[in-house]
């Protein structure tokens, strides 16, 4: 099903993610550091049940991803607190997928659980008379990433796994600066350009902005490792925080002010 969700401002989503981290830190008597212990937060603190399974088989949905790879990576039953993550993301079987797994867990157990479980009853009541087998409240497919319900959960996951304060501190430690980096700062750097070319080749990308993304991801990569997320997830977060800029901000004109 597609869950109908209201608009929520970015800062409200980020505040809730920060509140969850603060609640967890207080309950455990710990200081939050990267990488964020997302499994402990979801399973021990929020007390949600997490399983791995072949989601396409479980939900009886044919595969439609590129090369028939899975395009359903997570599902959550908001009425029972059950999360199923596709077995293709199992970090014990596929260590290279750990970043994607952690983000999916934060997306389901953070984003959907914290933001959307209060919306379940009205939607469930309309389906109850027709459902023989309980279906997940939200099925997360890569093809639906731009839907509001998915965007909100994605943004929540990024705030939860990459908290603003910790990312800014890591940025300063790694780069020795608090100011943002411009795309134009990176292009003359031969080493960075070479690394970007390697990333593009590895990803098999041909989009117009692939080079720019790869340049930013070459900067984001060591920070991503520290936080246990993918290069792309960290690049997006750094751009959202204004630490990576594609164009130089325009100075505000004083015309009409003086």
Report residues per predicted region.
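Active-site hotspot residues in diverse enzymes, especially metal/ion-binding acidic/histidine motifs
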Residues: 1-258
């Amino acid at each position: 099903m597609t869950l109908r969700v209201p608009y929520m401002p970015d800062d409200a989503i980020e505040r809730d993610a920060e509140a969850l981290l603060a609640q967890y830190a207080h309950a455990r008597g710990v200081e939050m550091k990267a990488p964020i212990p997302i499994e402990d937060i979801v399973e021990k603190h929020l007390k949600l049940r997490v399983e791995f399974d072949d989601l396409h088989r479980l939900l009886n949905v044919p595969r439609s991803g590129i090369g028939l790879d899975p395009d359903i990576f997570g599902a959550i039953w908001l009425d029972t607190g059950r999360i199923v993550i596709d077995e293709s993301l199992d970090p014990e079987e596929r260590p290279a997928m750990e970043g994607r797994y952690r983000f999916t867990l934060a997306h389901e157990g953070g984003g959907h659980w914290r933001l959307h479980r209060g919306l379940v009853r009205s939607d469930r009541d309309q389906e109850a008379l027709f459902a023989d087998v309980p279906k997940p409240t939200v099925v997360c497919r890569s093809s639906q990433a731009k839907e509001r319900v998915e965007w909100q959960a994605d943004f929540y996951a990024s705030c939860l796994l990459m908290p603003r304060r910790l990312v800014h501190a890591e940025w300063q430690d790694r780069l020795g600066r608090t100011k943002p980096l411009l795309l134009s700062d990176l292009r003359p750097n031969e080493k960075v350009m070479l690394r970007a070319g390697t990333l593009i080749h590895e990803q098999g990308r041909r989009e117009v902005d692939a080079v720019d993304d790869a340049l930013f991801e070459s900067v984001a990569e060591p920070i991503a490792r520290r936080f246990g997320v993918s290069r792309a997830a960290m690049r997006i977060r750094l751009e959202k925080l204004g630490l990576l800029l594609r164009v130089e901000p325009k100075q505000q004109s004083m015309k009409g002010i003086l």
